[in-house]
Amino acid sequence: MTKYAKIIGTGSYLPPRRVTNQDLAAQLAEKGIETSDEWIFSRSGISARHWADPDVASSDLAVKAAEQAIEAAGIDRQSIDLILVATSTPDFVFPSTACIIQNKLGINNQCAAFDLQAVCSGFVYALATADKFIRSGSHRNVLVIGTEVFSRILDFNDRTTCVLFGDGAGAVVLSASDEPGILSTAMHSDGSHVGILCVPGNVHGGAIAGNAFLHMDGQAVFKLAVTVLDKVARETMAAAEIQPEQIDWLIPHQANIRIMQGTARKLGLPAERMIAVVHEHGNTSAASIPLALDAAVRDGRIRPGQTVLMEGVGGGFTWGAALLRM
């Protein structure tokens, strides 16, 4: 049985269209909705976000990120034997976005490919799932992707939510290894909180039934997120017998700088050991953690041998964490 699943390559992609808070304020003003750069930044830490063009799908963003990750890993893409895609904004109702990505990447080895939906916790859930497949010995090289086009489900009459989210994709290649990689993972959910963060629409009779825009009770999400993130981080560290002071980098879900800072503070980690890209990306849901990871790998902050704690929280309510050695 394989001992570890190790990240051997990372990649990311943001659509070219960058929308600043000033741009968004001007757009909303045309609808008679008031907001400002100061209002948005003071509540979220967000200065800008990237939005995909109307003809660009989640799979298109994912392919760009995956190409980078595969190149960084230095493997033949035909050796990938599982593709896991975390997304809440799939290309189609079905088939899975993972199958679409498999085809676009030209991976023709008939490997398994499926989507996983845990909203903003999605990448951590997918990473944990990939870890289990590799540790079982059934798979050796797994492509894990978080990709979202949340701009498609935003209600631009609701200034409390439409200013927060962006589009993007991040990817990693996990490979079977005798060297320490993923040390521990934890996943949790509580369906009694479905209503505080959701898109409650569905397809019926060939049309959207109900409300297909994102709804969020920001205060309820904030209160619950800070509590569960601290608990799951400690659970994951305890499972690996790691103390907070041994963590080199914290990569939280990039939702809101106040939630991110609150979690770091509870863990006793200084702000300079937290990877934060929320100011430039906004909340990219399942893409946020791999986007932040790739940025820090490529700029040299995260180096081989360092210990990284990832944690995410999202609609469901879902939350999870992964502790790994790079």
From Swiss-Prot:
<comment type="pathway">
    <text>Lipid metabolism; fatty acid biosynthesis.</text>
</comment>
<keyword id="KW-0012">Acyltransferase</keyword>
<comment type="function">
    <text>Catalyzes the condensation reaction of fatty acid synthesis by the addition to an acyl acceptor of two carbons from malonyl-ACP. Catalyzes the first condensation reaction which initiates fatty acid synthesis and may therefore play a role in governing the total rate of fatty acid production. Possesses both acetoacetyl-ACP synthase and acetyl transacylase activities. Its substrate specificity determines the biosynthesis of branched-chain and/or straight-chain of fatty acids.</text>
</comment>
<keyword id="KW-0276">Fatty acid metabolism</keyword>
<dbReference type="GO" id="GO:0004315">
    <property type="term" value="F:3-oxoacyl-[acyl-carrier-protein] synthase activity"/>
</dbReference>
<dbReference type="GO" id="GO:0006633">
    <property type="term" value="P:fatty acid biosynthetic process"/>
</dbReference>
<keyword id="KW-0275">Fatty acid biosynthesis</keyword>
<keyword id="KW-0963">Cytoplasm</keyword>
<comment type="similarity">
    <text>Belongs to the thiolase-like superfamily. FabH family.</text>
</comment>
<feature type="region of interest" description="ACP-binding">
    <location>
        <begin position="254"/>
        <end position="258"/>
    </location>
</feature>
<keyword id="KW-0511">Multifunctional enzyme</keyword>
<dbReference type="GO" id="GO:0044550">
    <property type="term" value="P:secondary metabolite biosynthetic process"/>
</dbReference>
<dbReference type="InterPro" id="IPR016039">
    <property type="entry name" value="Thiolase-like"/>
</dbReference>
<dbReference type="GO" id="GO:0005737">
    <property type="term" value="C:cytoplasm"/>
</dbReference>
<feature type="active site">
    <location>
        <position position="253"/>
    </location>
</feature>
<dbReference type="GO" id="GO:0033818">
    <property type="term" value="F:beta-ketoacyl-acyl-carrier-protein synthase III activity"/>
</dbReference>
<dbReference type="Pfam" id="PF08541">
    <property type="entry name" value="ACP_syn_III_C"/>
</dbReference>
<keyword id="KW-0443">Lipid metabolism</keyword>
<dbReference type="InterPro" id="IPR013747">
    <property type="entry name" value="ACP_syn_III_C"/>
</dbReference>
<comment type="subunit">
    <text>Homodimer.</text>
</comment>
<feature type="active site">
    <location>
        <position position="120"/>
    </location>
</feature>
<dbReference type="InterPro" id="IPR004655">
    <property type="entry name" value="FabH"/>
</dbReference>
<keyword id="KW-0444">Lipid biosynthesis</keyword>
<dbReference type="Pfam" id="PF08545">
    <property type="entry name" value="ACP_syn_III"/>
</dbReference>
<keyword id="KW-0808">Transferase</keyword>
<protein>
    <recommendedName>
        <fullName>Beta-ketoacyl-[acyl-carrier-protein] synthase III</fullName>
        <ecNumber>2.3.1.180</ecNumber>
    </recommendedName>
</protein>
<feature type="active site">
    <location>
        <position position="283"/>
    </location>
</feature>
<dbReference type="InterPro" id="IPR013751">
    <property type="entry name" value="ACP_syn_III_N"/>
</dbReference>
